[in-house]
Amino acid sequence: MKEIAVFGLGTLGKSLAISYSNMGGKVIAIDKSQEKVDEISDYVTFAIRADLTEENVIKGLGVANVDVAIVTIGENFEASIIVTAVCKEIGIPYIIAKARDKLQGNILTKVGADEIVYPESETGIRMAKNLAHGEKFMDIAEISDTFSIIEAKVPESWVGKNLMELSLRKKV
């Protein structure tokens, strides 16, 4: 598994760090709050308290050899920019950054993020789709603008039949 560094231990960062660690991944979790670092220290490989607005502090964290940096800082966009830029500068191969909106996403991309996530809007879209489709769909994962993977509850009449027997294309 890849070794990751998670910068910012709010709801998203903490959940990501603990979940990935529970799957067997190595996680370096970093936050400015000693309380948040203490809460997560038993669950991750390393938990570090650091001022993420200081370039030299970030460079001194020993994260240059991780495979992926995930920047989930929510309250201080300046810190997100600095962390993203420094991670790119020290050669971390892949950087994922959290943004609130497209403007933040564009800025983070310009300073080095390879992937931008918008947790609030992505959750809202997923909830709306689930509500619109009622109980038909259990989960929807968007692969691209034109492809999705859907986990659906199937009618009893479909059980035991293959896709050809169902003639789904004729019914759509």
What is the predicted function of each stretch?
Residues 1-172:
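Cytosolic regulatory regions of ion transport systems
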